[in-house]
């Protein structure tokens, strides 16, 4: 499934990750929790995280 994630789903995952970290969850723990919640690998989560940061996805819009 994770290889076919649409952009809206990737943005949802990124937003959930940012929200978890904004709630003072440690980065490593937030990555594990969000990967588990969405059923994706840690590697895929990191790809999505990088994509979101590089493209200024919400909540980091210009």
Can you say where each PLM-predicted feature lies in the sequence?
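Short, amphipathic alpha-helical "recognition" segments used to contact nucleic acids or chromatin
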Residues: 6-29
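Short alpha-helical "recognition helix" segments of helix-turn-helix
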Residues: 30-35
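DNA major-groove recognition helix of helix-turn-helix
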Residues: 49
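Short Lys/Arg-enriched helix C-cap and helix-to-coil transition segments
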Residues: 55-62
């Amino acid at each position: 499934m994770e290889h076919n994630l649409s952009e809206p789903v990737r943005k949802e995952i990124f937003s959930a990750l940012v929200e978890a970290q904004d709630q003072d969850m440690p980065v490593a723990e937030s990555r594990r929790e969000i990967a588990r919640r969405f059923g994706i690998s840690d590697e895929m989560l990191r790809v999505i995280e990088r994509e979101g940061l590089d493209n200024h996805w919400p909540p980091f819009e210009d």
